[in-house]
Curated annotation (Swiss-Prot):
Biased composition (Low complexity): 77-88, 151-181, 388-400, 494-507
Protein name per its UniProtKB record: KN motif and ankyrin repeat domain-containing protein 3
UniProt record, GO biological process: negative regulation of actin filament polymerization
PROSITE patterns membership: ANK_REP_REGION (PS50297), ANK_REPEAT (PS50088)
Tissue expr: Strongly expressed in breast, liver, lung, skeletal muscle and kidney.
Coiled coil residues, start to end: 181-230, 367-404
GO CC terms in record: cytoplasm; cytoskeleton
Pfam families: Ank_2, KN_motif
Biased composition (Basic and acidic residues): 128-150, 237-261
Role played: May be involved in the control of cytoskeleton formation by regulating actin polymerization.
Keyword annotations: ANK repeat, Coiled coil, Phosphoprotein, Repeat
Ranges of Polar residues composition bias in the record: 1-10, 787-805
Amino acid sequence: MAKFALNQNLPDLGGPRLCPVPAAGGARSPSSPYSVETPYGFHLDLDFLKYIEELERGPAARRAPGPPTSRRPRAPRPGLAGARSPGAWTSSESLASDDGGAPGILSQGAPSGLLMQPLSPRAPVRNPRVEHTLRETSRRLELAQTHERAPSPGRGVPRSPRGSGRSSPAPNLAPASPGPAQLQLVREQMAAALRRLRELEDQARTLPELQEQVRALRAEKARLLAGRAQPEPDGEAETRPDKLAQLRRLTERLATSERGGRARASPRADSPDGLAAGRSEGALQVLDGEVGSLDGTPQTREVAAEAVPETREAGAQAVPETREAGVEAAPETVEADAWVTEALLGLPAAAERELELLRASLEHQRGVSELLRGRLRELEEAREAAEEAAAGARAQLREATTQTPWSCAEKAAQTESPAEAPSLTQESSPGSMDGDRAVAPAGILKSIMKKRDGTPGAQPSSGPKSLQFVGVLNGEYESSSSEDASDSDGDSENGGAEPPGSSSGSGDDSGGGSDSGTPGPPSGGDIRDPEPEAEAEPQQVAQGRCELSPRLREACVALQRQLSRPRGVASDGGAVRLVAQEWFRVSSQRRSQAEPVARMLEGVRRLGPELLAHVVNLADGNGNTALHYSVSHGNLAIASLLLDTGACEVNRQNRAGYSALMLAALTSVRQEEEDMAVVQRLFCMGDVNAKASQTGQTALMLAISHGRQDMVATLLACGADVNAQDADGATALMCASEYGRLDTVRLLLTQPGCDPAILDNEGTSALAIALEAEQDEVAALLHAHLSSGQPDTQSESPPGSQTATPGEGECGDNGENPQVQ
């Protein structure tokens, strides 16, 4: 007995179930055919499938000869229009068996309400339900062949009255074994049938659109017919043939596309697709006839004009989508670059600081240039006024007596004179003109001290000598030295190197009785009185009649108002710059004279003590005050005037960390008694043991390193600490031992409390430093002092050395300057 083999290469038919639940009583519906419905509405006969299986089995599975069996005609297939449900494609028919012995074997299946999935274009997958149905059918056929008798030649095998679809093949017929080419042909035919079904579905979807167009054209036709009676303009009659020709071409193109679609589809006349296509074709023919009948109407041309832009708009809308996608992809790369630059944020910080410094420098240069322009204008006006005043003065001097100038001066004291002198400070005395001309106009000098170590073993020079500076004027460096400096000096005067930051000391005055001291007389310099016989009296009159120029007075008044306001209130920078510029021009130049400074101080004192304290302690960009400059340039007469105000901050340090007291320890005096009196007064008013903010040196160490023996004695007399140490732990004795200052070493050893055994930060003593510097005499003196405990150094002291004794050269408790013996 031949077995029914299932071909696994058959495509999946897509049916979810083939055996629906039978009707009540186990009977099938008489209208159910022996077929399977595909998702596209195509019915496949199971007999055809069994025939394909028999062809695959070949001649080895041929049945025994017997009478052919007759087949009962199948029920007609329903049309394609009724094969689909409204919602989705479903299988409306299934297989059932008419065997009475097993009525419910094939009734176990899925519920009949499941929806069919559309056919997927991917590779076919085996359907277990179809395989189960085929195996069940094969088994029943084998059972039927074993139990049935051979039928007569003239009769056919009776079939089930229900038409269950079971049929037995003719046993006497031996079909020829098909080849692989025939099987491939069958598969291609089935695939072509499925493709045809898809095309029919696509054409069926276009039918509603065509019907909508037909309705729109009919409405347009009705509108055109309604407007035929209206008179047409003359312009439309000329363009009528062109619009009619355009409308005909559009109609022909639409009809051609529809006919081509019908030719490809070729639906049957009895199918719904065929009927709809026929209706569409008829509607188009009617439309062509109606359009032909309206050749003379202008409204037909408007239909053609409205139909063209629809297609163009569809194409224009598709273009921007691709461009927008490209635009959105561009910023991603830019953001990645911005993220990479975040790792380099450390580099722009230095560049930004440099830019800030450059901006500040530019602002400063602009301010200086503005001040210079204003000063130039003032000088030009003052020159013209001075020439006029000089001409008038010469005419008056020819006719007046010797008492006339002083009477004029007394009269000018009561009434302000409109004439202006070249300086911003004015005086009615005849000598004021010459004094102002002696002061050269210049900008604010910004200078710091340039440190240069002295040569070991060099002896201090006896000639006058001032410090060397590195000044910063208008953004450039310039070096300046005193005119009294001698080339034979081995020592170089220094201050401190310019630091990156600034530090200022506290204005700590030693007492409030500075006015009780006897200030040194101001040096007249180049200022000469034109009448020597009346020298004393005009000088006293000039001191009582000091006035400021109107412009400087206004600036001082504005500055006084700012000082009285709270700190949070905005200040006027122009007034501050003007006052500072004039103050440093008068008091801080190398050739500045004491008389103009005294006149300006008197004029500022009249406006208020608070303004006087502010002006006296004004500092430039390097932290230097007028006291720093006067001491550094050796203008101790000006320094005495500043100390007389009682508001001068003696201990204030500049940006290099040095105070005016430390600079005074390096200054050489010109007039021995007068200048030394000012220096001693400065030492007594300040803190002689104050240390520089950078190196920690004291004024005593600076004086020793520069060979100022007289300043060393004065500092010791004012209470300088001999054992004070700097930042490296060095003392004044170590400094003197290193430079070979033998006289200074003797002077230091005579001071009570001097400890030569002190060690610095490296554990080195003064004796070791002297031996290392090859200072044999100093080393022998230190060794003798350490060996004997208290050697007699008085007999070995040179005649020029000074020894401080109790009660001589010491400062008083009230801060008065000592008297030099």
